[in-house]
Design a protein with these regions (language model features):
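C-terminal motif of bacterial Sec signal peptides marking the signal peptidase cleavage site
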Residues: 16-18
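Bacterial N-terminal signal peptides that target proteins for export
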Residues: 1-8
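Sequence/structural signature of beta-propeller domains
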Residues: 20-344
Length: 344
């Protein structure tokens, strides 16, 4: 097991002044000519209005049962079936971001959440037979307001709006490492295969941070006005058989950008639009995203779940926010058609 160094690592990221200081851009649903995909399901709207839903996490058990967790950052965490029905919830405070791991010993999932009400990390246990969620422990954070969060099997990474990201153990020991960015961060994901941490600095881009402490952080992808459009929000990694893909929410133009993890080459940029019968709307202003590469009978390549910041019904009437559920094959079909980029 690779251990994190006991260090404080601070660095001055590249600042894209045109993005950081320019006029704000209107939110749009889709750029002209952008590739598009549709969701096959959506969750019930969260019970709270305004900006409430935020970050999802996908749980697939060894027997193929699938449960989607999502934060309601006004009250806690909710659990949904793959069809989108709410099946459990816990009111534990303003939980902003979540991530988790499967615990083989207990045959359950452990989910960590950044709780802005208590300024803590909450750790939950989720069982799938029956489906239930319980708060098992919490630990205090020396942060002004916990915000972004991601995990590995051994560590929890949590950041605040001041650009500070800290590493903690699951039992609350830490911080054992601190990474300081120049501006606000949120989305992050751990590449457990290569021991790297990817952090989205919202108006600057995506940083790759080597967790061995020996390699300086590097800017993996910079924001611009065409591809990765700030804010940079949710991040997640899809590990395939022959290559891995980093997926990012490009919130500034309500799209998603896929990168080859090894080369940082952009594979695709796409939007999620309404189904042909408008039974499921598209997405706008997405915060959190989650991917799963676990195969099930119905979805042999896995799943993508994204938050929808402007949820509407079939008649275009506004609803509370929710999460959209997609088949990863539909996402993968948007990648470059050359065989080098396909993972079949």
């Amino acid at each position: 097991m690779n251990k994190l160094p006991y260090l404080i690592l601070s660095f001055a990221p590249l600042v894209i002044s045109a993005c950081a200081n320019g006029p704000s851009k209107p939110r749009v649903s889709m750029a002209d000519g952008m590739r598009t995909v549709t969701a096959f399901a959506e969750t019930q709207p969260v019970p709270d209005d305004d900006d409430a839903a935020d970050d999802p996490y996908i749980m697939v058990t060894p027997t193929g049962d699938t449960v989607v967790a999502g934060t309601n950052k006004r009250r806690g965490v909710e659990l949904y079936s793959l069809g989108g029905q709410r099946i459990a919830s816990i009111d534990s405070g303003r939980v902003n971001n979540i991530d988790g791991i499967y615990d083989v010993q207990s045959a359950s999932f452990r989910i960590a959440g950044s709780n802005r009400t208590t300024t803590q990390v909450d750790v939950y246990q989720v069982t799938t037979e029956p489906v239930a969620i319980s708060l098992t422990t919490s630990f205090d954070l020396p942060l002004k307001e916990p915000y972004g969060l991601c995990v590995s099997p051994t560590h929890i990474y949590v950041g605040d709006k001041d650009g500070v990201v800290q590493a903690w153990t699951w039992d609350g020991q830490g911080p054992i490492a601190t990474f300081t960015f120049e501006s606000q961060t949120e989305g992050c994901v751990v590449d457990t295969r290569n021991n790297d941490l990817y952090v989205g600095e919202e108006m600057t881009g995506i940083w790759r941070v080597a967790l061995d402490g020996e390699t300086p952080p590097s800017l993996f992808a910079a924001t611009d006005d065409q591809n990765l459009v700030g804010d940079v929000e949710g991040l997640d990694i899809y590990h395939g058989e022959s290559r891995s893909v980093l997926l990012a929410s490009s919130q500034g133009d309500s799209s998603y950008v896929a990168y080859d993890l090894a080369s940082a080459e952009q594979l695709a940029k796409f939007a999620i639009t309404s189904t042909p019968d408008d039974s499921i709307d598209g997405t706008q202003d997405t915060d959190g995203i989650a991917v799963s590469n676990t195969a099930t009978s119905a979805h042999p390549r896995g799943l993508l779940v994204v938050q929808d910041g402007f949820n509407v019904d079939q008649d275009q009437r506004a609803l509370n926010q929710n999460f959209k559920i997609l088949d990863w094959r539909d996402v993968e079909n948007q990648f470059a058609r050359d065989s080098v980029y396909r993972d079949e």
